């Protein structure tokens, strides 16, 4: 069988798997069970009081879902349940307290962390991954982002809330190792402002930060990072930063999201919404500004494992990137409040009409409803963000204060020796084609991320 025929069969099989999964997820009886599970988890009996038969049935159905959809073992399901119990206790305490927490962990830009803070965080992430206990906790959390979540947590309104909850679980897992760690965010507008010719020389892809930008990652805290068998063609974490393929988060898009008074409801910044602001690049190509679309560009820019849905969270850069996406969303929510809009109730419902419905239980976090991801609970009781300032950037060895009081990344200067790892073959499933400056999805399951524009 020739290569093209084989590829066609792979794409057809992936499409059929995706359709079958959607049919399973939208089964009315299953949805009733999921709703019961969410209700039961919110009102679990205290002490030795037995759960109701309906709740026992719902818990068993949830465990079966996690086994069938994510292929989790009993140990992995129990681990995730333990994280759910921790987050549930946080929510119960929040309801009793009903006051905003005074001292919250602060998520900062990664380059503005102190040396101690950065090394502490990176070491903790490595410890989570390299732990040899059963199950591997990092891999279990990464597997929550496998192909099954595609129609539920991407391409629609639930993208923002689902990933906010996902980050919270990841951060809770890290704090089990070191209670004083807090995630940082990677503000790629700082790298965008270097100019396209210099993007690949950003100093975050060095041994002090994320490691090398191309090939197998052999430098930095995430070097020699094993990938689960069969996930990619590589046994270890790899990247493939290539000019003209993806881009950092456009600082013009960020400015529009933060300040444009014409985009003050979620529909104007979410996938499949309306009323978008636009950007026109130097080739005259125009694209809509959405948070998810700009996010996709960064996945393509980093490349390698980050470029595909299933292995993306295996690169720790995934979580720093998504922490920035969450920061961008919170800045947008602040703008909404300035214009007397309530971000907790403004749920647009774009995307798959069932899976992105406001009251549909979140896949993987099924005691949350989708709209719960839009709650103010997180920013009031779990963490807060600290915006980069020129004063802080001035004192960091990794940033400078540029024109217009904008923080700009420092570079590994062109022409200097930048270590690169062994090259890794492309994934056997081709996920993109390029037409007119736009990357188009050509596979449903195991897909890559759509880039709204690959040229500037």
From Swiss-Prot:
Signal peptide: 1-22
Domain of life: Eukaryota
Main location: secreted
InterPro entries (UniProt xref): Di-copper_centre_dom_sf (IPR008922), Tyrosinase/Hemocyanin (IPR050316), Tyrosinase_Cu-bd (IPR002227)
Tissue-specificity statement: Prismatic layer of shell (at protein level).
Assigned keywords, A-Z: Copper, Metal-binding, Oxidoreductase, Secreted, Signal
Enzyme Commission number(s) from the entry: 1.14.18.-
Residues that coordinate or bind Cu cation B: 295, 299, 322
GO CC term, one of those recorded: extracellular region
Record's subcellular location: Secreted
Molecular function GO labels: metal ion binding; oxidoreductase activity
Name of the protein this chain belongs to: Tyrosinase-like protein 2
Taxon lineage: Eukaryota, Metazoa, Spiralia, Lophotrochozoa, Mollusca
